[in-house]
Amino acid sequence: MPHRTEPSDTPAKISYQGEPGANSHLAAREAYPDLEPVAYPTFEDAILAVKSGEARYAMIPIENSVAGRVADIHYLLPDAGLYIVAEYFLRVRHQLMAKEGASLETIKRVLSHTQALGQCRATLRKLGLKPVPEADTAGSARLVSESNDLATAAIASRLAADIYGLKILKSDVEDETHNTTRFVILAKDPDDAEPGNGPVMTTFLFRVRNVPAALYKALGGFATNGVNMTKLESYQEEGTFNATMFFADIEGHPVDRPVQLALEELSFFSTQITILGTYPASPFRKEAAELAASGQIPLKRMS
């Protein structure tokens, strides 16, 4: 469990975007088995559920090791009014499923979320299947279950196959064996990790000043103070073509002296710094680092 679930006035529920059987549903069940996962149609709705007190946490996917960042999340987090209190990494295993009576010979097209289709692109090409984007992986499984079309299949989780009564035609059809999605857990109130109690991550947003070399100078403090920045992404703010807003993850706690100095230097070249959360680093990070250090490179699935 990535974050404690002490008694609270809010319901023992965790919100997620999608339909029952979605990977977010699976992540919520694995990370918080004592909380009830509740589905919402959009990320905004899942976030609002926490703000309104309908749910204690929101399980929000933020990036995938194969497909990159999840669209729209970077725009929602700054104005969400919530805080990151934990992170969770889910090993994504996509299953090719269809109605009873269908087979690899009968199916012609596959429904799924755009990211899932992209993560299975090589496999679908090899099988000669046409990808058809839908809003959600689990929703695609539901659509197939409601149809009598034996030429249409879905890519979704094993949980979705169980929920919607579909037959798995081919297991683990993702192209990369290291396909992993990182989720952040959002709460209404901040709950910073304790300093000195294990590895810590800090996530923040910043806007650099509109002067030459501002970003270069802003990031210098992290290098000179030995603070490891594990993520840095820019994105355009609404109504402008200037990519001056940045989303960053660093290793360390804001009370750590090196982090303090790095953030202080960052402030000299920024017009805004917003810390979204300081939380325990997932054990997955250490496992991935050890794997990389050992020289074991994740392999692309070829069959």
Enumerate the language-model features and the residues they cover.
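Domain-level signature for soluble enzymes in the chorismate/prephenate branch of the shikimate pathway
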Residues: 1-303
